Amino acid sequence: MAVCLPDTQDDTPSIPIKLTRVGVTGVKKLLQLERNNKRPIILVPTFDAFVDLPNDQKGVHMSRNPEAISEVLDEVANDSSVEVETLCAKIVSKMMSKHEYAKRVEISMTTDYMFMKESPVTKNKTQEMAKLKAKAVGYREDGEIKIRKSIGAEVIGMTVCPCAQESVKESDKNKLLEFLDEETTQKVLDTVTFASHNQRGVGTLLIEVPEDREVKGEDIIEIIEESMSSPVCELLKRPDENATVLNAHKKPVFVEDCVRNMMEKIAKKYADFPEDTIITSRQENHESIHRHNAFAEKVTTMGELKEELRI
């Protein structure tokens, strides 16, 4: 005879306080995304899954979260059209049906993503890694379930400090004027690339995706890379290294500039997205001459962003 085990999660808590997010973090899965006439993409994503909890319930049914993730992954195993943000939306829908007491459900996914690129001069092909991110949030409103999904990426690049570069330039100008006239000195200043301290920049960009639209992860990665002083590359021969350093120092940017660059580029590329589309841009630069890092962030809607940019 089977033993009937108690379900203590449904008990009334001694302290009647509702909780914003309860769930599981760090759920790792193997995900194979089929592609028409191409090799499948193999990912090992990490999922975080949460629901809110009403004040009259002691706990959530925790096992239902990884259960929902596993069930959806099995369902999409042979689907060549599914995108990672749509996958997250499907998991949210599944969790909504399993947690009937929840008014809000959230799932986020992060995975390493490999993409190919060429070194700038020798054109050697190299495998590069970025973090691909996806998220979906579901709400119960007026008896209906509404789900909003997002896709994004986190990419490493290189940034060069404009302030230090101008200081070096001014210092070198004064030295040149000791033995050159002003006209010749100016020609040198216009020709030579000046030194500065640089950083390993980590750019993050996320955008909500409407139901009838698609945003490619590769496009997000490209926007992030182009918003810094220079992309970085795993394989650089001497000519590539020279070009990377020179190109970066010809495009110095503050951490604030990186965020603004990302926002401007994504607003122009997806200007026809709904006005309430939420966009998040974040940049953290690992300083070379300080022990601390520099950080900047903007969270906005497409409508607010277009109004600021007047587009």
UniProtKB/Swiss-Prot annotation:
| Cofactor annotation comment | Binds 1 Fe(2+) ion per subunit.
Q: Which keywords describe this protein according to UniProt?
A: Hydrolase, Iron, Metal-binding
Which pathway? Cofactor biosynthesis; 5,6,7,8-tetrahydromethanopterin biosynthesis
In its UniProt record, a GO molecular function of this protein is: GTP cyclohydrolase I activity
An annotated GO BP: tetrahydromethanopterin biosynthetic process
Q: Could you say which protein family the record assigns here?
A: Belongs to the GTP cyclohydrolase IV family.
Protein function = Converts GTP to 7,8-dihydro-D-neopterin 2',3'-cyclic phosphate, the first intermediate in the biosynthesis of coenzyme methanopterin.
UniProt-recorded name of the protein? GTP cyclohydrolase MptA
